[in-house]
Amino acid sequence: MSGNITTAIKETRAFLGRLKGDEEGMAFIEFGFALPIFMALGFTGVEVAGLAIANMRVNQIAMTVADNLSRAKQSVPLGLPQLREVDINDALLGARIQGGGSLEILEKGRIVVSSLQRNASGLQTITWQRCKGKLNAPSSYGAQGATQPSSGTSGFQGMGAGSNRVQAEANSAIIFAEVSYDYKPVFGDWVLGKIRLRREAAFYVRDDRDLTQIYNPSPTASASTCNKLDSTF
């Protein structure tokens, strides 16, 4: 019996000695410890890159919509050029095309376009506002008709965040675009979490244009009013 125990002890010591000197499996052990770290870094890198690209594309859409609608106009005989509902729809449709099938800007986001002007009292006001997209993300500055108070600094004072606020001059208008978008991560929400992108852009209206209203001559177009969460035209 004691001989068997002695033999077992010797074999155990011999095995431990061989194991101590065996370095063939060390690389696999090190790789096993390092793999989760490298995978986490890789996933994070891909997500950050995807987020940066989406952010850039959303920003470009905001700039394009505001720029296009600051230029859009239809010449009329013996009168100032007019902005039409179809012109606004064309700009919003162009944003969907610009975003492409991968971004799905109108399915996962919302575009809000406002015309910031001065009213007869010289106060900043949103004269008109149009929207498109299924995401429930209203304007951060109020709906159509929002007007600067006649006194005080509270309430609507213009559009833009913080020191970047813009105000329209007399007899002019600023086209202000807000684009909100729910970013869909490549690997799921567990890497960066849920992220909503939001970008703004503002352009002064080019040249002379009738600023009193949006026209809708025959054949009429469906107005992209902000009481609808849709992506159709």
Task: State what each model feature region is.
Residues 102-106:
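Amphipathic, coiled-coil-like alpha-helical scaffolding segments used for oligomerization/assembly
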Residues 96, 107-198, 202-205, 213-220, ...:
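Intrinsically disordered, low-complexity regions enriched in Pro/Ser/Thr/Gly and acidic residues
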Residues 2-97, 114:
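Alpha-helical assembly-interface signal, strongest on the long, hydrophobic N-terminal helix that forms
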